[in-house]
Amino acid sequence: MKSILIEKPNQLAIVEREIPTPSAGEVRVKVKLAGICGSDSHIYRGHNPFAKYPRVIGHEFFGVIDAVGEGVESARVGERVAVDPVVSCGHCYPCSIGKPNVCTTLAVLGVHADGGFSEYAVVPAKNAWKIPEAVADQYAVMIEPFTIAANVTGHGQPTENDTVLVYGAGPIGLTIVQVLKGVYNVKNVIVADRIDERLEKAKESGADWAINNSQTPLGEIFTEKGIKPTLIIDAACHPSILKEAVTLASPAARIVLMGFSSEPSEVIQQGITGKELSIFSSRLNANKFPIVIDWLSKGLIKPEKLITHTFDFQHVADAISLFEQDQKHCCKVLLTFSE
């Protein structure tokens, strides 16, 4: 089989490997589609602090089970599945309270362990989620990005009457917008970004107001309009955003952070405590695959609005370059694998 391997930062190769055999409790997935994420680019370029090399990247992937290991029902062969990349121990403190995404021995497929940019992938059977026949392949491969939005909104608990500010109209920001509008029916969703084309995408995904904040600070715009967001979600992940979010937020608001920067964020306790703000962080997803599969089955989210490009997996280097360089027109890039 062929696999996409990052041998070391900035060194990508398509290599020939033996087709793996699933061990006890595992299934083998013949991969059909995979999605490129920012973290794949970061691993490729050497900017992900958690990655170990050499590494087969890819944590968004979909395919068909073609073999099972001991202890897995043979009836699962032939199942269409999307794979949850979060592999956890199941018994540490985070796992015991429903947060396998921060397991003390967390392994993320495509980061800590080999992922799905390969013609075949062996994964824990419990991580392979069956996809209803009514859900198309290209939607199924988008489940993992939407689980990020499910995790974020699980923390933020949006209501219809919230005024929500989403920083960032990249792929994750747009999944969050779709969930806010399609699942939670939030009446007022504001998106801030510095690229007009991305803001247009935000409108297509349901944003009520899309603001280019490259020239005028959000504080000025919101003061003029009398707006105080009750929920702020940082999908741009810059360390400067927390300070601004605390200033902009309504009293009793919630703020959800997703960034992994090692740079400090300057924030004053008085700004947080004076308004009794609730600040959450969100990493990966905590058992959100069934939730997103249900949303897809009910037509509450529209993954097709985010897919802009598709490449054969053997052109992955071109696909990643496009993803990195064309932020105006490129949103979600899919890789196809041989039938």
Curated annotation (Swiss-Prot):
Induction: Repressed by RspR. Coiled coil: none annotated. It is an enzyme of class 1 (oxidoreductase). Binds 2 Zn(2+) ions per subunit. Zn(2+) 2 binds at residues 89, 92, 95, 103. Keywords: Metal-binding, Oxidoreductase, Zinc. SUPFAM superfamilies: GroES-like, NAD(P)-binding Rossmann-fold domains. PROSITE patterns: ADH_ZINC. It holds the Pfam family ADH_N. Belongs to the zinc-containing alcohol dehydrogenase family. PANTHER family: L-THREONINE 3-DEHYDROGENASE. Not known; probable catabolic enzyme. This is Starvation-sensing protein RspB.
